[in-house]
Amino acid sequence: MQAYIFPTTPGKGKQGLLTKWNEKTNSGYGLFIDDDSCLSLMIGDGAGQVMKLSSEKKLMRKVWYLVAASFDAETGKIKLYQEPCVTPTNAGLGMSLLHPADETTAFVEATNNLQPRANDAPFLIAASTVNDRSERHIHGGHYKEALTPIELPEQGFVYNGKIDRPRVSKKALSKSEIESLARGYGGCSAELRSEVTGAWDFHANITNNIASTHIIDTTSNHLNGFIVNLPARGMTGYNWTADEMVYHHKPDEYGAIHFHDDDIDDARWEVDFTFELPDIIKSGIYAARLRINGEDSPETEDFIPFVIKPPKGKATSKVLFVLPTNSYLAYSNDNLATNSVVAELLAGKVPVMSAADLYLNEHREYGLSTYSMHSDGSGVCYSSRLRPILNMRPKYRHWLSPSLWQLNADLHLTDWLEEKNIDFDVMTDEDLHVEGVDLLNRYQVVLTGSHPEYSSEKMLAAYESYQLNGGRWIYLGADGFYWISEYHPDNLNIIEVRKGEAGTRAWTANPGEYNNAFDGKYGGMWRARGRIPSKVCGLTFTAYGFDVSSYYKREPDSKKPECSWIFEGVGENEVIGDFGLVGGGAAGVELDRYDLEFGTPHNAFLLARSENHTNLMLQVNEEIHFSVRGYHGGGTENPMVRADMIYYKTPKDGALFAPGSLSWCGSLSYNEYNNNVSKILENAIQGFLKEGPLP
């Protein structure tokens, strides 16, 4: 057995590399990292005897190694190889030139007459079998090559790190044969190829993407397999030269998969119950209330949210609310309150955590958010809704926001729409991705949520086309359309987010790993692909701060005949939104600005601008090229720290209205819904609903 490995937590304890080993019966064989951080081979006869051979040289973190073990059953000879393979580029941000290499190089020989007992454990890469059966299966969806259900073993001792070019042979190979096979199965002699049982090249099925969960055995045995729980693909391999930064331009240098012991794509829970909803229920956001013994308390009650959509292809209202479910997924089960070193600094206070936060801190098996780090310190780039998402609950209070965040904050809007008797349908980001502009064109007015931060390419195209086709769009958030997020091509329950070289971000992808596995395109900020948000919605993300929110004052454009109808019932000098449920004001948490240099339409009207933000409200870092004292300060001294309210007309009697603040909707219900934030939004929606040209 052999492979190139790039361990990222070699000191974390026993981890399986290449194993056909059953932990319960101590039978079979396996190549492991042991409890001493060394490479080891284990052979078990299933009768209580286990042979372990260790390299006795510690593996170093973020260093590529060629590792191999050979066992001659006739002679009992065992050989174990551990050799670093370091180049100036292949470790990315890890170690480069290693001196001296012999500190972590090993060649160990031994003799052993113990024979490995055959077992029913599958051959695993990056884990070891604890029990042969788990009663959990993979089939269909992103496992489309699994034509019938395949039962998974209960695995353990999961490896953290990369693996490239694993091989298994049916004879004990010499060192030169190991090195020849490591370079490539196809380049080996016919004699050596005949001895190889499996040669898995993870780059073999790279096309214009590498979304596949199938792994290819390049031998004539075709022992193809599956990667489970979506470890990261499109990863630089042991031979990455940095000549190409895109994996499908030079697939041979992207033969690695990065495995993590906390990867999850699907909890694989069984269905407990189903409930058929009557047709008379209108479109909206609902929840299934679950209770223990019918008791109403935080300890005995939970709410599982879901959306009831209008009949397929039909609109049942003139107004559509697009629920920003991509953003919900990106933040799902985030653990920043317990893990981030800057949580208290961001919030300006000690984070107030809920029971869900504390539970998730202890139960990492529910998976992480794209704001989290894996246990080895690498960023989480996939998020799936096929698991319990404990911070996507109607009663959840997020630790970061001054009040509510994501789904809960968007319920401020639906509550207000109900209060104002404005009929509306609800659809999701996923629906928009699938149906495109045809979905939006069924509605006269389209509303966003408070934080539509994550968008796919098809979603952006739909919003742009809607505006060109006379659509009337109200963007009710901030930090919108900021990060690229793409759906898995075979399973829309899963999104991918790569955090690139710029942006206000929780982590940064390693060099050469900026391109999405799901579509092969550059990940990170839409700005980096020339699609800055202000070209989509007229505003661009400018500042963030999580202590208190502020207010707006009207600008001269608001009094022009084309715009004054939006402010009907609002005084010329009236302070707008110095109240609310999110930080005490309508302008807060995250802010967007009007900027003609960055794509705000030249016909846009600047209606109002926020002021008096604190110094915890800071400008986004992608616009800060030098850190200069006193130049890029907080809200009291930086003119870029502001929320701009805008309005502009689009072709065919279309228009856009946007207040430029994430906390805007939190002010709608103040004073029994009788306030100027509520009045402005009601004027905008009712004006957009009128037939004919706008003023």
Q: Where is each model-derived feature located?
A:
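Short, solvent-exposed loop/turn and secondary-structure capping segments
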Residues: 30-31, 42-44, 79-83, 90-95, ...
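Ligand-binding face of N-terminal immunoglobulin V-set domains in extracellular IgSF glycoproteins
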Residues: 259-295, 304-305
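Glycine-rich, aromatic-lined ligand/substrate-binding cores of catalytic
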Residues: 490-672, 676-678, 687-688
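Helical hinge/lid and interdomain linker segments adjacent to catalytic or ligand-binding clefts
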Residues: 262-263, 274-276, 280-282, 399-489, ...
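Extracellular glycan-associated modules
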Residues: 1-233
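Aromatic-Pro/Gly-enriched surface loop or interdomain linker
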Residues: 230-265, 295-439, 692-693
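Structural recognition of the beta-strand scaffold that forms the well-ordered cores
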Residues: 40-42, 124, 198-201, 318-323, ...
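Solvent-exposed loop/turn segments at secondary-structure junctions
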Residues: 24, 48, 130-131, 207, ...
